[in-house]
Each structure stands twice: as structure tokens, then as C-alpha cells.
């Protein structure tokens, strides 16, 4: 039986005004912002650990963060670690104004002559529009692409994968952290129990959860990249078994180890 508290909260979230959502995100109430917003140092370390484990480096590299959230902290940290340039793409970002006090540690990264301070275009490019706009500028391709808990919110992942591939230089590396859980964390697999029509009409939040599984991401990225690998970061087999009989067949492979996965790192190159 479907949990009543889940259904009530999902419907409320579905129809919650965007202004209220933004307010709750800013204050960290009920709806949690992404790690780049609430813990940027941890986000930077997560990216760096993945890059270093792959034998790669940010030194002299042009890096794209797909869905940066609005804060520049991770971009600044990457530049501090030796990156040549950072491109930030997010059509839904809530930009955090950069004051002189915040800009000062960045040294020559900002032009602090006005308020808010503005990143120097030779070091940071900010695109508050879909990735296609960056591609339309015919700017330099990037060497590394990073994202954290972004792809599960994308409506057209196939299109996003194609555009990300187009933005990447030959030999470029992708590191995408993907959260496969229902974002109502008490019920990590509950969203998989509903038909597409019911989910889209009544339960899908304004931030969109596409409900794609590991095999979907593997298929979509393999269509545009020569190499794709998925590292499991977490799984919840007990929670999966509790709702296994209710999960719709299109979300199942029959392999519990794969079906119970909740968080992954997808690499593509």
C-alpha cells in the first residue's frame, strides 16, 4: 500500500509555488539545497577525489560544471587548484551575489570595482541558460565535465549527453555523481511504484525527477561516448526489498544488486 504521508507531501511539493521553494532552499528548511550550496568544500573534495582516482588532474584544464547551483565556491577552489578556466552552466541557478569581502581572497579572479563583484571572463564563464547556449558561442571545448545530483533532474538526458559530448575536447573526461533515490529520503524507491502518467500529473516535483536507473544512464551515455563506467557509491537492499513487489517492471532488471543501487559515479570519456 502506498504511504499516505508520502502521497500528501509529494502532491504538496508538486504544486508548491516556486517562490516558496526558493525561500525554503535559501534557508535550508524542508528542502535541502545541493552540496555545492550547503557544503561547497565537500563538493570540491568529492570532485577532486574522483578526478585524482582516475589518474587525471585539473592543472591547466578547462572545466565545465553542469548545474552549479549559484555559488562560485567550487569554481574558485578549482582555479586555486590550478584549473585554467571554469565554465558554469545552470539555467535554474539562484546566483549568490559576490561582495568585496568574498571576492578579496580570489585575488585576480574578480573585478571588484563594482558591487556585486564580477568574475573575470578569462577565468570564469557563467551561463544562466541551457548548455546549448554555451555551444552556440562556439567557445573552446572543455577538458573535464563535472556534475553532482543534476542528471536525475534533467528531462532529456539523451539530449544533455549529446550536448555534453559536443562541449568536450577529444580525450576529455566526465564525472557525474547521480542520486537515483526518490528525494523523499524515507522512501528511496517509492517513486518507482507509479505509472508515468500518475507520476507526471500528480507526484513529480517542480525540480523534476526523471526516475532513470543505472542501465538507462549507461545506455544514453554509451550512445555518445566511447567509454562509460559506473561506480556504485551506495545501495539500499533492505529498503528495495520492502517495496520490490510494488515497483513497476520497467524499473527492474531482475538483478537485485543493480536494482537496489541508490547513488553512483558515472564516468564517460
Where do the protein language model's features map onto the residues?
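A C-terminal cap/extension of S-adenosyl-L-methionine-dependent methyltransferases
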Residues: 126, 219, 228-269
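A short acidic, Gly/Pro-enriched loop at the edge of an enzyme's catalytic core
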Residues: 132-145
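A short glycine-rich, Lys/Arg-flanked "PGG" loop and its adjoining helix->strand segment in the class I
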Residues: 158-173
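Conserved class I S-adenosyl-L-methionine
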Residues: 58-70, 173-199
